[in-house]
């Protein structure tokens, strides 16, 4: 039994059900969908926005403090040029691109899953408070990086339509 759960994608679901009824192998289209969503998620990281275009919360002072060392300040403790450049160029969720590069998909004949295997990925996506997670150095705001934008939905629907035509 194949279960399809694509919230808000009624037309897309109808296309997928037509493919299933025709006995078609869905793994190629699910692979194309996964590839698209990985690329779209990478764009979310590069633009520091959620799939719906909402800007992510800015980095906190704790984030900046954790990335700065003695070579980033002058003798009075103020940021030097190197430290100021680090702070100015630091995007949320991007320190060394590890989380972004961990985004992958797994396609099968019954569906596609997009996500990360990084343990901290859920915390970065959903956020968390020090009250709920005492080991945190402070509250972490939600920065949604996974999900489909309206543009993604259009592309995913087109991928399915094209698969139906082939």
Predicted regions and their residues:
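Short, Lys/Arg-rich flexible segments
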Residues: 1-166
């Amino acid at each position: 039994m194949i279960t399809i759960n694509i919230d808000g994608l009624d037309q897309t679901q109808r296309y997928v059900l037509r493919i299933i009824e025709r006995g078609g192998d869905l793994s190629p289209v699910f692979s194309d969908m996964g590839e698209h969503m990985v690329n779209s998620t990478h764009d979310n990281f590069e633009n520091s926005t959620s799939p719906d275009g909402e800007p992510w919360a800015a980095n906190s002072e704790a984030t900046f403090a954790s990335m700065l060392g003695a070579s980033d300040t002058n003798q009075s403790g103020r940021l030097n040029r190197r430290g100021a450049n680090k702070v100015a160029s630091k995007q949320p969720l991007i320190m060394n691109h590890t989380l972004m590069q961990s985004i992958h998909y797994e396609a099968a004949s019954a569906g596609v899953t997009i996500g990360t295997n990084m343990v901290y990925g859920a915390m970065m996506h959903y956020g968390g408070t020090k009250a709920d997670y005492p080991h945190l150095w402070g509250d972490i705001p939600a920065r949604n990086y996974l999900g489909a934008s309206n543009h993604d939905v259009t592309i995913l629907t087109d991928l399915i339509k094209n698969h139906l035509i082939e």
